[in-house]
Amino acid sequence: MSEIMHKLEKIREELNSYFLERREEIDIALTSILANEHTVFLGNPGVAKSQLIRAIASHINANYFEKLITRFTTEDELFGPLSIKELKDNDRFVRKTSGYLPTAEIAFLDEVFKANSSILNALLSIINERIYHNGDKIEKVPLISLFGASNELPEENELLAFYDRFLFRKVVRGIRSCENLVKLIKLDEEYKPKTTISIKELRKMQEKANEVDIENIIGYLVDIKKKLSQNHIYISDRRFKKSVKAIKCFAYLNGRREAEIEDLEILRHIFWDDIDDILIVSKVIFDITNKYAEQVLDKAEIIKNLKNELKYIDIKKIGECKKDYNKLIEILCKMAYIRLELKKIRNEAIINKRKTDFIDEVIKETDEFNNYIEGILNEL
């Protein structure tokens, strides 16, 4: 293992030891940086989206810019104040961009979809073309990756083009494991990176990642796009083309010079637009990369349906309604059976040396739902 590859692995380890149940988010962010692409993390407040992004940025000796976006955020706050001297001496509107987004190499915009129309066009030019129109001059922007965080997906049409420029999307959920919740309490408040890399080292990593051979997986990639199309999920040519680089970078992150079928799993975080499409996209991809995870998706769909059934039960009056009580017992029994099936699938995956990250995630979701139902019954 080369020195820079060793550094990358150390960064990955440090992040995973502090940010519990965030392995996928960390891999997505690092892949995004290697690919010179952008990532948006979605999720409820308090799931450490912002803290994780800051921590990842702290491992890179780069110009960093961060801003919380509101409906009232001005161009001055993002792109720099107007130069009074230029205005007085030359009658030109020029911004002093040093220390602001146009000079950043790594950037983070919190509540990113609250950006107003007055700054959207400039943001699009920066993240897509890496240029900023400063008065009558065009400035090159050294941006490597822009990270966004939001509690929700954008709904306004004018934001959709902006959302599309984030190649990677990930819904971040709260910690589910009781064991990890105990660990969380004991963690230091402040994350302190031990391993850092320079921009020069990062560029070297990017060069090496670009050399990864993808010949063996091209056919599978085309097949995934075709199957998603059959499921009415549209992948633009631009997004499809960019996904190739993402696969290369993900393979490199995993220490490979040739992309393997499992590297296609990074596409789970690229090929969806609506949250409702995540399961379909994952199912199509896992059907090719990991049959065990694909089996788990069927169980995840059943769990989703059982959760929906729970919505029609009046929890407050459960002790007074025998029908609702019996329904709750039925759901609990089904969940117990699903958990046994999931454990069986997980054991088979381990025997066959396949990844179990996604399986573990669904098992945790099952346990969480089971505990919720048992809590209701225990209160009766």
Swiss-Prot record:
Superkingdom assignment: Archaea
Protein name: Uncharacterized protein MJ0079
Disulfide bonds: none
Organism name: Methanocaldococcus jannaschii (strain ATCC 43067 / DSM 2661 / JAL-1 / JCM 10045 / NBRC 100440) (Methanococcus jannaschii)
Entry GO MF terms: ATP binding; ATP hydrolysis activity
